[in-house]
UniProtKB/Swiss-Prot annotation:
Primary location group: cytoplasm
GO cellular component terms, semicolon-separated: COPII vesicle coat; endoplasmic reticulum exit site; endoplasmic reticulum membrane; Golgi membrane
Organism, scientific name: Encephalitozoon cuniculi (strain GB-M1)
Pfam family, one: zf-Sec23_Sec24
Name recorded for this polypeptide: Protein transport protein SEC23
Residues engaged in binding Zn(2+): C53, C56, C75, C78
Function: Component of the coat protein complex II (COPII) which promotes the formation of transport vesicles from the endoplasmic reticulum (ER). The coat has two main functions, the physical deformation of the endoplasmic reticulum membrane into vesicles and the selection of cargo molecules.
Family membership: Belongs to the SEC23/SEC24 family. SEC23 subfamily.
């Protein structure tokens, strides 16, 4: 079943918690019926219009029945017949339309119409940089981003610190800059009343927005001459930074002139908002020169800031715009309060801790990567409609975006974007019949072309408990349960742990076989056997053990969990560990202290960290230079291949993870020690129980507790 599940994911981008659906029983009351969908995964492209059902607007797909005599098709969603259009008439069983072929359960249609405007990139640049070196980092990053923006894209630029400066990009001399106060929130109405800034798209384009190829030299000169905020920072005070006001100004400038169009705001920042609407922290340090973390639940700032940024996110979502937060800093910038700006719009969140230059520049660059066709890999202004057959009910979505106007809307989506769709069977679902789901997503490509992606899948309802259990996808369930359980904000870590334990106990009682009072008799079916292990590692992950995280770090990790495809999100729950033996063996090993052997190299992948660890013997051999000797070529090979594997993971991933090479008894070894199960092997000192004790406690609770 596992191979079949992965083949389906590769073709359709879907993972289901249950791949066989119960017609009766309580299986889905313990684990909901959910679909984890890679909404922007690549698919076969058809240069034609979709064929819609006249009754329910579903799209023709391989599951539909074709009446070749009448040249009509039966919709599996509403069960009504629709006549085939003229261009599709004459098809036969041996001459089918591409969308009817079994392998084309997911296809993308390139529509004949285009968007009026190309993609708009509006740069919102924080000039309250940390110091001269970090100001250079900002300028270098801006140059990389400008280089990768498409030539025909429209570009705008605003910089802010204490005040906001909106720059004109036209060819007129002298070129004007409009200065705005950072004290207030801006709306489209306010800008119109000011007279000079915003009246219509005809005034904005050519003035505040220009094609990149028409103003490229001007933009580069602006970046090269970009100066830090001229207002001095007093001792024991933070820079006066009006992030909220600047973002509201940018949105207000474009929301009425570019509704339902591809607009991307890129927010470059190096610190928290300390002034004006959206302030997340007081301007004065509690202690002179001290960089403290934000107080996530500070009543003076947290509530108003979240409300303000949520309002901005709703405005962007309603017109199909999105915002990326590109932060490089050593302090919290307020992501814990601003998360809706990306979460509700489909934007990307980059957090380069300690001003890590490689992570910051490479992550910002990857946002603008291109496909083999030359278009940006991200899609814009996406609207997804969910269709279900009459025996299923669509319940909603967990993940990026927002329900708006009868669809699920996201201003942008990346190849890695994953959302969770919830369904429930209706009472009239019957054994032996199929339930059908169709996901229809329209979006704009960076070349102005409009596309419609259609994914259709079907699963059988059954009364057989064994068949339902056989179709259980424990990896997808682990990711979904983590997302579902973390929707709630817990006051204490113990509260979250108790909720995880409670759900795991209920699950085990429902599906395990055991003899009352006999812990050793408990056994889960093979398809579920690894699920308790995932929950054990979930309890130990940085998603739950947030005590040593800053509020921004906790928000960042949870954002990754909600946004990444199953295989990557699973690494946040339980990392992968690859072992390279000095005799040439390469294999995946358990994330366990017993795997830390002295004669191996380990590659740990936690998604946000990639670590190459060299065992004690290997590290000693390297120090003594054995890998440079011809007779020890094998040692040189595993050193090279392990590092290449790690760097490949970093190069392919967005955001770019932190990377380090360490060895036995070095400081960075603590990263590996944090994640491995402390089973007793190796020299790991910890207060955490190991999996064996956790599993034994679970067994005892289940077999001795009759509740």
């Amino acid at each position: 079943m596992e191979e079949e599940i992965r083949n389906i994911e590769e073709n359709d981008g879907i993972r289901l918690t249950w791949n066989v659906w119960p017609a009766k029983g309580d299986a889905t009351t313990k684990i909901p019926l959910a679909c984890l969908y890679n909404i922007h995964q690549t698919a076969d492209v058809l240069e034609c219009e979709p064929i819609y059902c006249m009754s329910c607007n579903s799209v023709l797909n391989p599951h539909c029945n074709i009446d070749f005599g009448r040249q009509s098709w039966n919709c599996v969603i509403c069960n009504n017949n629709t006549t085939l259009p003229s261009h599709a008439r004459g098809i036969t069983p041996d001459n089918l339309l591409p969308e009817l072929l079994p392998q084309n359960s997911t296809v993308e249609y390139v529509l004949s119409r285009e968007s009026v405007f190309p993609v708009v990139f509006f740069l919102i640049v924080d000039i309250c940089t940390f110091d001269g070196e970090r100001h250079t980092l900002l300028k270098d990053t801006l140059k990389v981003v400008l280089e990768k923006i498409p030539e025909d894209a429209l570009v705008g630029f605003v910089k802010y610190g204490t005040n906001i400066e909106l720059l004109e990009l036209n060819a007129e001399q002298p070129r004007r800059t409009h200065l705005f106060s950072g004290r207030k929130e801006y709306t489209a109405e306010i800008l119109k009343s000011l007279g000079g800034a915003s009246k219509s798209e005809s005034q904005i384009v050519g003035r505040f927005l220009r094609r990149k190829d028409e103003c490229q030299e001007l933009l580069y000169n602006m970046v090269e001459s970009l100066e830090r905020d001229p207002f001095p920072v007093l001792p024991a005070y933070k820079p006066v930074r009006c992030t909220g006001s600047a973002v509201s100004l940018a949105i207000s400038l474009l929301e009425t002139s570019f509704p339902d169009m591809a607009v991307k705001y890129l927010l470059f920042t190096q610190g928290p908002c300390t002034f004006g609407p959206g302030t997340v922290t007081p301007i004065k340090f509690k202690e002179k020169g001290r960089n403290e973390h934000l107080e996530e639940n500070d009543p003076m700032y947290a509530g108003p800031a979240r409300k303000f940024y949520t309002g901005l996110a709703e405005r962007m979502n309603s017109v199909g715009h999105s915002l990326d937060i590109l932060a490089a800093t050593i302090v919290d910038v307020g992501i814990c309060h601003m998360e809706r700006l990306t979460g509700m719009t489909g934007g990307m969140l980059i957090m380069a801790q300690d001003f890590d230059r490689d992570i910051y520049i490479s992550s910002c660059s990857k946002i603008l990567d291109r496909s083999s066709e030359g278009c940006l890999v991200q899609g814009f202004n996406a609207k997804m409609h969910v269709k279900t057959s009459k025996n299923l009910e669509y319940k909603g979505v967990i993940g990026q975006g927002r329900s708006f106007g009868g669809s699920w809307r996201m201003g942008s989506m990346f190849p890695s974007t994953n959302i969770s769709l919830l369904f429930d069977k209706k009472p009239d679902a019957k054994h032996g019949e199929f339930g059908y789901v169709q996901l229809i997503t329209q979006y704009q490509r960076s070349d102005k072309r409009l596309l419609v992606k259609v994914t259709t899948f079907a699963r059988m309802f059954t009364d057989s408990r064994e068949d339902v259990i056989y179709g259980f996808d424990q990896e997808a369930v682990a990711v979904f349960q983590a997302r579902f359980l973390l929707l709630k904000k817990y006051e204490e870590i113990k509260d979250c742990e108790r909720m995880i334990d409670k759900n795991l106990i209920r699950f085990t009682k429902t599906f395990a076989r055991y003899d009352k009072g006999e812990p050793s008799s408990l056994a889960l079916p093979d398809s579920m056997a690894y699920y308790p292990n995932y929950m054990f590692f979930f309890r130990r992950s940085l998603l739950v053990q947030t005590g040593n995280n800053s509020p921004d770090e906790t928000t960042y990790y949870s954002t990754l969990l909600y946004n990444q495809r199953v295989s990557d999100a699973l690494k946040l729950i339980k990392p992968t560990l690859i072992s390279y033996h000095y005799q040439g063996g390469v294999e995946a090993v358990e994330v366990d202290s017993k795997s830390l052997e002295p004669d191996v190299i380990l590659v740990l992948d936690t998604f946000h960290n990639v670590v190459v660890w060299r065992g004690e013997y290997v590290a000693q051999w390297v120090r003594e230079g054995y890998h440079e000797q011809a007779e020890y070529e094998f040692l040189k090979d595993i050193l090279k291949s392990s590092e290449e594997r790690a760097r490949l993971l970093c190069n392919e991933r967005l955001p770019t993870p932190q990377f380090c090479i360490t060895e036995q008894n070095k400081s960075q070894q603590r990263i590996l020690h944090h994640y491995v199960n402390p089973s007793g092997g190796g020299s790991i000192i910890t207060e955490n129980i190991n999996y064996e004790k956790f599993e034994e406690a679970l067994r005892r609770v289940v077999v001795f507790n009759s509740e």
